[in-house]
């Protein structure tokens, strides 16, 4: 199972920003525990719970967590954090230095992980690309020449290749886990104030509306609620019908509503066709079903990547405008005016939302929800939290820009280091297709003419299956190595499978 523990620099950066905004130790710790997810947030939630429920002071609660946590770096950080607070009262300087130190360590660790990924990629290319190709050629030639059983060749194609690829993908998932997403929904009723909470006391913040008391709905109210729910469903359906392309780009998996029935229909037609071999039916169904999803996911990933690349510069523009004394709404308008990339549309929509009377932070929450990547959500949450203790708008967005740029540099370094191996896998697969042409068009025909007892048809079928299965396996591995996840793997698999299927049909026709 993948380790979803975020980097230690994440809580350190959050605490540093909160202390810089003049928040107390209790407020800073509680803020991170409430607004983050993962191992560190869970540990700090225990300290907050002990303070609120057991009456312990925050120093004792964090000291207990430091003594019980099973993460040595986090344990050391908490001990140093407590010592700094007790001795100097303000841990801002320590947190700044610790953050710089952790970012250097994380960059070094990422370089080591990229080196390990390169080793895994070389193993996969050597064993499951070149090795499989060599094994297929050897077992094919020996089996046809000796007239033996095709079982060894079938074991390689139908057993070793898919199982080995699955093991490789699992190892990559453990070595390079996906980042932990923050809380998905940000539409809280939050209006930051400059009120400060007494340290160590769990008082209610004035910016949070109290929870509504539970009550029994009347029959009329229940009828109205049901009508509203039906209206929401109708509105979503109407929005989809008005602009299906836009909705599909937001949620590519919805395309399966159309592609899955189309794939089933195509499969039935091909299955009952007397001229199409059955081994071409399943690959064709796979392509019809998954190609639209792969293309839409590719467009979505490209736009998201461009947005993540632009986000640090947008945060810096907002921070720079705030330094000149502009309110947050004007800072957002300045960012929308200066930006010319993919975020311009979202920034303009946010500014328009505010101009129509929307609350600034609620509009920012909706902006982050639309972007839907961790750095945007974390920055908006952080800005809302620091707004309770400081009127300095520049601080959270400058911190968000630094955090986003650091995360982006780590991911970019990993992707650039793996592109070479993705290219090698593509080249190796097309070499496999070329070998298929040679073996099917020259060698097998020559052996069939010289030895009529050889069952060349079965070997030719296994060779065709090897090309098709190899295309799917190489595509999934290429997607994982490029850092795009399962959707990227499906895209590469569709490209390679389409090439392999076209080559196999050409061999069958010729």
How should each PLM-predicted stretch be described?
Residues 108-172, 257-266, 284-290, 406-480, ...:
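Bilayer-spanning, highly hydrophobic alpha-helical transmembrane segments
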Residues 502-510:
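Juxtamembrane boundary at the C-terminal end of a transmembrane helix
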Residues 158-245, 297, 323:
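Membrane-cytosol interface segments
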Residues 1-66, 76, 185-215, 267-369, ...:
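Juxtamembrane/interface alpha-helical elements of multi-pass membrane proteins
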Residues 117-124, 207-265, 416-424:
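Loop-to-transmembrane boundary segments
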Residues 300-303, 480-490:
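Membrane-helix interface "capping/anchor" motifs
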Residues 84-104, 204-237, 387-402:
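Short, charged cytosolic
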Residues 59-80, 94-113, 225-235, 362-382, ...:
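Hydrophobic alpha-helical transmembrane segments
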């Amino acid at each position: 199972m993948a380790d979803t523990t975020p980097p230690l620099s994440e809580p350190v950066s959050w605490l540093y920003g909160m202390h810089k905004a003049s928040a107390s130790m209790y407020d800073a710790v509680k803020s991170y525990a409430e607004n983050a997810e993962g191992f560190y947030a869970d540990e700090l939630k225990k300290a907050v719970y002990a303070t609120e429920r057991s009456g312990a002071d925050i120093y004792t609660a964090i000291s207990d967590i430091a003594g019980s946590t099973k993460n040595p770096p986090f344990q050391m950080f908490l001990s140093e954090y407590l010592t700094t607070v007790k001795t100097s009262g303000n841990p801002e300087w320590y947190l700044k230095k610790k953050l710089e130190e952790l970012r250097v360590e994380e960059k070094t660790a990422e370089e080591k992980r990229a080196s390990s990924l390169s080793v895994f990629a070389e193993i996969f290319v050597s064993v499951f690309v070149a090795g499989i190709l060599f094994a297929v050629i050897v077992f094919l030639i020996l089996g046809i020449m000796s007239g033996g059983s095709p079982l060894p060749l079938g074991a390689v194609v139908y057993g070793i290749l898919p199982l080995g690829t699955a093991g490789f993908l699992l190892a990559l998932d453990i070595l390079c886990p996906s980042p932990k997403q923050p809380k998905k929904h940000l539409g809280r009723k939050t209006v930051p104030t400059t009120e400060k909470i007494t340290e160590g006391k769990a008082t209610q913040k004035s910016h949070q509306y109290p929870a509504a008391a539970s009550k029994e709905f009347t029959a009329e109210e229940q009828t109205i609620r049901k009508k509203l729910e039906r209206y929401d469903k109708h509105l979503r359906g109407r929005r989809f019908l008005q602009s299906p392309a836009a909705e599909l780009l937001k949620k590519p998996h919805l395309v399966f509503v159309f592609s899955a029935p189309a794939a089933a229909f195509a499969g039935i037609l091909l299955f009952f066709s007397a001229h199409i071999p059955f081994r071409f039916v399943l690959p064709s169904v796979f392509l019809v079903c998954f190609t639209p999803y792969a293309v839409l996911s590719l467009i979505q990933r490209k736009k998201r990547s461009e947005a993540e690349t632009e986000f640090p510069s947008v945060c810096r523009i907002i921070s720079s405008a705030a330094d000149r004394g502009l309110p947050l709404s004007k800072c957002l308008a300045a960012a929308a005016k200066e930006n010319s990339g993919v975020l311009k549309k979202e920034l303009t929509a946010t500014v328009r939302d505010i101009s129509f009377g929307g609350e600034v932070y609620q509009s920012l929450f909706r902006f982050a929800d639309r972007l839907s990547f961790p750095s945007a959500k974390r920055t908006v949450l952080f800005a809302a939290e620091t707004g309770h203790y400081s009127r300095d708008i520049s601080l959270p967005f400058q911190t968000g820009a630094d955090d986003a740029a650091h995360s982006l540099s780590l991911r970019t370094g990993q992707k650039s280091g793996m592109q070479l191996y993705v290219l090698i896998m593509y080249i190796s697969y097309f070499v496999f297709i070329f070998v298929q042409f040679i073996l099917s068009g020259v060698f097998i025909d020559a052996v069939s003419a010289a030895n009529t007892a050889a069952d060349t048809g079965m070997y030719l079928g296994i060779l065709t299956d090897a090309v098709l299965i190899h295309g799917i396996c190489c595509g999934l591995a290429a997607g994982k190595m490029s850092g795009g996840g399962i959707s990227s793997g499906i895209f590469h698999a569709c490209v390679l499978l389409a090439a392999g299927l076209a080559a196999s049909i050409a061999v069958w026709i010729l």
